Structures are given as structure tokens and as C-alpha cells.
A protein has these predicted regions:
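Short helix-capping/linker turns of helical repeat alpha-solenoids
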Residues: 14-16, 46-48, 78-80, 110-113, ...
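Conserved alpha-helical positions within TPR/SEL1-like repeat arrays
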Residues: 18-25, 50-57, 82-89, 132
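TPR/TPR-like (Sel1-like) alpha-helical repeat modules
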Residues: 76-79, 97-115, 135
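Terminal, low-structured helical/coil segments at or just beyond the last alpha-helical repeat
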Residues: 111-148
Length: 148
């Protein structure tokens, strides 16, 4: 593990974005949240959408919703299905059902449009959960009564 960490750091120093992401993941798995945030942020700055989503997850767990939604939205803008789902969750939690449904629909669109993504994101579970959220919202909320 120390050897892996050293190799990844050398690659990251050469601006290798996947190495930065992996360092963030490695630090997260070891419970080193500040290191994890640092490496995820570096990868996110270079456009790595899963790093953006994971960084947002950390901010969310810390109670920093402002930073969390900022990074979820950045990743969602690049069609990251996990981030799209998380933005949908954010809006659902804030009772903005119309916008939540739009984001959940985008998840399904991305998964349909890019079937290879299913492998990368274990997206069959994501697809099922997204459909469940949409069905729940359709069944339990009157869209006309919602604010945008």
C-alpha cells in the first residue's frame, strides 16, 4: 500500500489526473478525509467528474451543502450519472420536486444513451434507484403545486 501510494504520487506530480483521483480514493478508504479532499479537488480541477462527485459526497457528509451542491452540479453538467442522481436527491430533499424529476430523468437518459457507462458506475443499481425515485415522486407529489 505504501508502494502504491508512492507510485500514485509520482504520477500525480506529473499531472496524471487518474492518479490524483486514485490518491483521493485511497486516502478516503483509509479515513484520511483532508488528504482525500485535496486529491479529489486536484482531479476535479482537471475535469474528473467522479472526483467531483466524490468530493461533493465528502462535503455533504461534513454538512457543507453549499460546497457539495457546487461540485455535484459541476459533475452533473458533464453528464456524470451519479452526480445527476445526487443533484436530484438534493432538490428532492429541498422539496423542489419538478427539478428533482428533471435530474432523475437525465440519469436515465445518460444511462440509455451511453450503455457502456452501466459497467463503469455499477449503474444497473443506479438505474433501478432512479426509476424508484421517479415513481415515488410521480405517485406522491402534485407537480403543479411545486415551486421551481
Amino acid at each position: 500500500t505504501r508502494e502504491v501510494d508512492t507510485r500514485l504520487k509520482k504520477a500525480a506530480e506529473k499531472d496524471h489526473v487518474v492518479a490524483m483521483y486514485e490518491l483521493g480514493l485511497f486516502a478516503f478508504e483509509q479515513g484520511r478525509m483532508e488528504d482525500s479532499k485535496k486529491w479529489y479537488a486536484k482531479a476535479a480541477e482537471r475535469g474528473h467528474t467522479t472526483a467531483m462527485n466524490n468530493l461533493a459526497n465528502i462535503y455533504s457528509k461534513e454538512g457543507n451543502e453549499k460546497e457539495a451542491i457546487k461540485f455535484y452540479l459541476k459533475a452533473a453538467e458533464k453528464s456524470n450519472p451519479l452526480a445527476l442522481f445526487n443533484v436530484g436527491n438534493y432538490y428532492e430533499g429541498n422539496k423542489n420536486i419538478k427539478v428533482a424529476k428533471q435530474y432523475y430523468s437525465k440519469v436515465l437518459h445518460v444511462l440509455k444513451e451511453y450503455p457502456d457507462i452501466l459497467k463503469e458506475y455499477s449503474a444497473s443499481d443506479l438505474e433501478t434507484e432512479t426509476m424508484n425515485r421517479l415513481l415515488y415522486l410521480e405517485k406522491n407529489f402534485d407537480e403543479d403545486a411545486e415551486t421551481e
